[in-house]
Amino acid sequence: MVIMATSCGSDGVSSETVPQLPGRVTVPPEEPPVSTSPTVPPVTATTSPPPPTLPPSPYADRLPTFDVARPPAPLQMGLPVDQTQAAHLSRIETADPVAFITIDDGYVRHPEALALIRDSGVPVTLFLISSVAAEDPKFFSDIREQADATIQAHTVTHSRLKGRSYEAQRQEICGSADQLQGLFGTRPTLFRAPGGLQDPNTLAAAHDCGMKAVFFWREAVNDGRVQFQEGTRIQRGDVVLMHFRQTFVDDYLAALQSIKDAGLTPARLEDYLP
């Protein structure tokens, strides 16, 4: 004998007839429970596309190597206590075997600069003319983000400051810091006067614009040659000056090699200031 059973849904309407064998009871399939929770769409994992890979610098085989790219625990130099003027420095007093590479202006955006700085693996400080940086901010932001670079102030127009009024100098210094902050998101705290020419008004205006120090230099690199103010070797704590020029590759390689020959390693200037 075949027993016919019917099942009813929750609405009381009969569903399909299920045949049953003698001695066995077939239990109708249960309907899935009705969820009262809000429906959550499935989450699809997304990843941002990686930034384009920059090919190695064609000059990578000429880059000197350093045992340590930067000191693990740099010593901070105390600045002169003056409530009215920024400190004026050309070197850092430190016992660490380090020197500091600074690159000025920004007029010439050499196509090899980014790869060369990145592949060297050492920190650099860029003292940029803000109006020039504004012409191509991506060039400098790429160096900052893909290499090990910081950006500091070097006036708005690169005009001579020494001998000008406090207010005129303040407009150049504060104006450059304001513009660089707008371009790159971080306000500079260091300043270099064009040509290194400064006077008491420069130091006072720099202080009032929030600059910790105004930097000169001990060595300058031109046409692939390092020029020394004293002696024939870079000394520990020295600040080295070069520029964004057509000779950038030769100048940068010369600066690195001179630091290497002196038994020093490039370090980040900002790490040695409070």
Feature annotation, model-predicted:
Residues 3-7:
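C-terminal motif of bacterial Sec signal peptides marking the signal peptidase cleavage site
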Residues 8-90:
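N-terminal low-complexity, Pro/Thr-rich disordered segments
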Residues 21-24, 118, 123-125, 159, ...:
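CE4/NodB-like, metal-dependent polysaccharide N-deacetylase domain
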Residues 58-153, 157-160, 179:
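Active-site beta->alpha N-cap acidic-glycine motif
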Residues 81-94, 248-274:
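C-terminal domain-boundary segment and adjacent tail
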Residues 99-103, 124-128, 150-153, 189-192, ...:
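Structural recognition of the beta-strand scaffold that forms the well-ordered cores
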Residues 106-109, 128-138, 160-167, 192-198, ...:
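Acidic-and-aromatic substrate-binding clefts and catalytic sites of carbohydrate-active enzymes
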Residues 187, 197-236, 266-273:
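His/Asp/Glu-enriched short active-site or ligand-binding loop at hydrolase and phosphoryl-transfer sites
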